[in-house]
């Protein structure tokens, strides 16, 4: 049966579960489930092989930027040019975000492994991963823009406008939509995840 004719969100005939004695057995069984699944799993494959890798790279890079920003905040040029009242909060924010963003990297590795096995545990971890990364990305982007406004608003030679605030709002809305769509997509494919 072609995938174009498969309209149900669960298997008409569940693939026969083989004897599973190792992780390689679970991976082979997961691949068979994906092959036989009645709904399209194109986004699933993209999410597993592309999104998780990009998320790890971007989060690792952002964590490094946060650490660099902490040290840069103590430089004389920043101390003299930025609004002094906002600097302590900016430093604290970057320290916290560097930890939260760095934590995403091992989570991406675990997520990739979980999506290779498609167990019930994998589905629970997937929901946690989506919520955690969406929240961290939204806070990281929006707070960075807002701190930029707080640090350099009214400072000569720094172009701060309403665009920064609008971009902060947009990033939160975008990540909320991203989260909802992904949760819905994987919920419709809940039957993929089984022990």
Predicted regions mapped to residue ranges:
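Interfacial non-cytosolic loop connecting adjacent transmembrane helices
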Residues: 72-92, 140-167
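Cytosolic juxtamembrane helix and N-cap/initiation of the first transmembrane helix
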Residues: 12, 18-68
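Cytosolic juxtamembrane helix at the C-terminal end of the final transmembrane segment
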Residues: 40-43, 109-122, 176-195
